[in-house]
Amino acid sequence: MKKIIVFYASYGGGHLSAARSIKEYIETNYEDVDIRLIDCMEYVNKVVNKVTTTAYSEMAKKVPRAWGKVYWKSQAGPLAQISLTSNKVLSIKLNKLLQDFQPDIVVSTHPFGTQMCAYLKKQRKLNCKIATVMTDYAPHDQWLELNEYVDYYFVSHEEMKRQLNEKGIPKEKIFATGIPLSNKFLLRYDKPDILKSFGLSPERKTVLFFGGGEFGLGKSKTLKIFKTFVENNNNIQIVAISGKNEKMKENFEHLVTELDKQDYVKVLSYTDKVPELMSISDLVVTKPGGLTTTESLACGLPIVVINPIPGQEEENATYLEKNKVAIWIKENDDVEEILNDLFSNQTKMREMKIRARLLSKKNSTKDICKILLKE
């Protein structure tokens, strides 16, 4: 029996989603595999985990530009060294888990898990394969620390593979599989049934609007953009998802009522029906987290990017814009003009959908698991 640990960390939801997709795929498609899913930071030190995840979310929410500076400064120099040294110290606790479980493979969807395991391998306390699964569309050097002890790097696209190779990672270690994706986004759904269940019309184009966000970024800007969509007269209907942000849900509902658009706008809080909703949508409006981006591309959906967190999400937005699958609404853009241009230009929408499907790596999770388990 093979033993696998998949580590993630709770700095944003994407690392857990990617880790869970790998675990679910292996459990569904492989026999004789014992696989565990563990939050590495929560496991090694609950207090450190609480302090650092709270600091990350508060910075991203309240002072995003400051977070952007941290992101770039942690590529190298003192900040990068502090992070690496901290993970070396924290690895002592992780070592006990690894010694008890004796995994054949350790997978990490966050650089901290990779650093801890690579350091233990360097110290000859760990003797197994280490795999890193990168969950954005541009590399950050934190992923590459102690890379000589890492066996696999799974990245989102070929250009990223070239970038890692230029940073000294051997080509044979790098696989452009794409970011792990839940199988739910690959299923075929009965569109008429889904439209009916959400009270939506088959005669209108559907916009899926992710407006809450994990960190409630850019409230006033989000509401301004949302209002422009709600007021738009291009025969559209909107499903707005506020996530766990109750205040944003109230703001959405108030705006919809004020504009008397209840028939054309549905406001939801957290929902597990995102795969179904994407299957009936024509456009996604979202901040460009790695996982939401991956899911949108897999469903062949053009993306309107709003409120990217400085750092990784701005890099994701740049990648999407460069590949002509997204329109990035920036600070002083005329949102109404952008929307009218988009909805009145069906050729442009079709081309964006085609490019999204071409850019997507829908078999990402399957391909990662095949490489890890040497099928």
Where are these regions (language model features)?
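C-terminal "capping" alpha-helix adjacent to the active site of nucleotide-linked donor transferases
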Residues: 331-348
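Conserved N-terminal ligand/cofactor-binding loop architecture of enzyme catalytic domains
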Residues: 21-97
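A nucleotide-sugar donor-handling region in carbohydrate enzymes
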Residues: 151-214
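A short, well-ordered alpha-helix in the C-terminal region of glycosyltransferases
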Residues: 348-362
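Donor-nucleotide binding loops and adjacent catalytic segments primarily
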Residues: 192, 201-280
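Active-site and donor-binding regions of nucleotide-sugar-utilizing enzymes
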Residues: 69-168, 173-176
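C-terminal alpha-helical cap of glycosyltransferases
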Residues: 362-375
